[in-house]
């Protein structure tokens, strides 16, 4: 009914498999239970590879409807662009699902009269244990679930020796 499991009948044998939708629900429930049981700060560590984006981050990050909110809610106007990281392991992609249930710092959706721009959730993070940044979760994105986006005060690529193919570690602290 909810498509959380699939039943496979083969002769007299019946197998039950958890679907991707079911797995996502389990991850969400696990996150909710963990939050209710543990009031301390937890840390999510992710690893991936720096990849080029489509250049759209610069456009969206420069929109006044976003920049005003970023300034008031995270304390700065981010560099106009995002740093795209492809998560190399499935376990890191699965770890990202818990952010769907977490509040983060919410940047509200807005309209400019012609179109509506989706909400953004920000989570404080550290790139390679040294560079302060924000992991952003977007209401709308062209990326698949293996690619995450980071924002910062400055152009991370320019201020570091990072380039496409560089290995990246991201540490996100979550207040429960």
Each language-model region and where it sits:
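Conserved segment of winged-helix/HTH DNA-binding domains
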Residues: 22-45
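Short, charged beta-turn/beta-strand-edge "cap" motif at the junction between a beta-strand
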Residues: 91, 173-176
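Basic, amphipathic "hinge/linker" alpha-helix immediately C-terminal to the N-terminal HTH DNA-binding motif
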Residues: 11-26
């Amino acid at each position: 009914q909810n498509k959380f499991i699939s039943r496979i009948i083969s002769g007299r044998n019946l197998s039950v498999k958890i679907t991707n939708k079911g797995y996502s629900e389990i991850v969400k429930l696990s996150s909710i239970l963990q939050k209710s049981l543990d009031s301390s700060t937890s840390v999510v560590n992710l690893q991936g590879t720096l990849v080029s984006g489509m250049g759209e981050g610069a456009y969206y990050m420069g929109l006044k409807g976003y920049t005003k909110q970023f300034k008031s809610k995270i304390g700065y106007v981010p560099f106009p662009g995002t740093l795209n990281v492809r998560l190399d392991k499935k376990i890191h992609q699965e770890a990202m699902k818990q952010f769907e249930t977490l509040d983060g710092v919410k940047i509200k959706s807005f309209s400019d009269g012609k179109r509506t721009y989706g909400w953004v959730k920000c989570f404080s993070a550290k790139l390679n244990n040294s560079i302060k940044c924000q992991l952003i979760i977007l209401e709308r994105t062209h990326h698949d679930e293996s690619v995450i986006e980071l924002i910062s005060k400055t152009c991370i690529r320019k201020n570091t020796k990072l380039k496409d193919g560089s290995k990246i570690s991201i540490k996100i602290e979550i207040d429960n």
